[in-house]
């Protein structure tokens, strides 16, 4: 039995899960609706307010899919009930961020500004306080999508190990390197 797959997913109040005959799992909650196609070999059922994921055999493929789909369904349930939030910190002199509609404008030390069109499912806000680093906050119900977008924003200016400048997740610890020592 998969250690992750055998754990049932508890459905909070106001969250509904339905499975179609074609194994399409739909999760509806107060924040929205998410769908996920599940492999035909994996069985998903709802028992006493808990989602149970089962596999037919002990094959390596089935074991892997068992844990995968249980985690995906768990992420969907958490997304539609609580949502996901990612905060990115822009560390560097002159780094700025503004969010209008679904366009994120970033100044990251390049000779040009960067305009990033965000998917409609993601809401973004930028907070700039005097004397502090700008913070970009992303909110979404889809964990995979918010992770992908935040990784793309982070890759626009990777963290530099000597001074620690760049885009980082809030609270991320950066390994710093010592610079060259001057010889006499």
From Swiss-Prot:
InterPro entries, per the entry: Ribosomal_uL6-like, Ribosomal_uL6-like_a/b-dom_sf, Ribosomal_uL6_a/b-dom, Ribosomal_uL6_bac-type
Membrane-spanning intervals of the chain: none
Gene3D superfamilies reported in the protein's UniProt record: Ribosomal protein L6, alpha-beta domain
GO annotation terms (biological process): cytoplasmic translation
GO molecular function terms listed in the Swiss-Prot or TrEMBL record: rRNA binding; structural constituent of ribosome
GO CC annotation: cytosolic large ribosomal subunit
Pfam families (alphabetical): Ribosomal_L6
Keywords: Ribonucleoprotein, Ribosomal protein, RNA-binding, rRNA-binding
Assembly and binders: Part of the 50S ribosomal subunit.
Described function: This protein binds to the 23S rRNA, and is important in its secondary structure. It is located near the subunit interface in the base of the L7/L12 stalk, and near the tRNA binding site of the peptidyltransferase center.
Family assignment from sequence similarity: Belongs to the universal ribosomal protein uL6 family.
Protein name according to UniProt: Large ribosomal subunit protein uL6
Source lineage: Bacteria, Pseudomonadati, Bacteroidota, Cytophagia, Cytophagales
């Amino acid at each position: 039995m998969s250690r992750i797959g055998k754990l049932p997913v508890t459905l909070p109040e106001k969250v509904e899960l339905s499975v179609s005959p074609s194994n399409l799992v739909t999760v509806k909650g107060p924040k929205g609706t998410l769908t996920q196609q599940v492999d035909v070999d994996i069985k998903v059922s709802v028992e006493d307010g808990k989602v149970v994921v089962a596999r037919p055999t002990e094959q390596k493929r089935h074991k892997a899919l068992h844990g995968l789909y249980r985690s995906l369904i768990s992420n969907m349930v958490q997304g539609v009930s609580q949502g996901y939030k990612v905060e990115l910190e822009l560390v560097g002199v002159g780094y700025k961020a503004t969010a209008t509609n679904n366009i994120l404008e970033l100044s990251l030390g390049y000779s040009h500004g960067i305009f990033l069109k965000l998917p409609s499912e993601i809401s973004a806000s930028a907070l700039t306080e005097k004397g502090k680093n700008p913070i970009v906050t992303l909110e979404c119900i889809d964990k995979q999508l918010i992770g992908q977008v935040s990784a793309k924003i982070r890759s626009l200016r990777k963290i530099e190990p000597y001074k620690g400048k760049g885009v980082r997740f809030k609270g991320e610890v950066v390994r710093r390197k010592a610079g060259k020592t001057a010889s006499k």
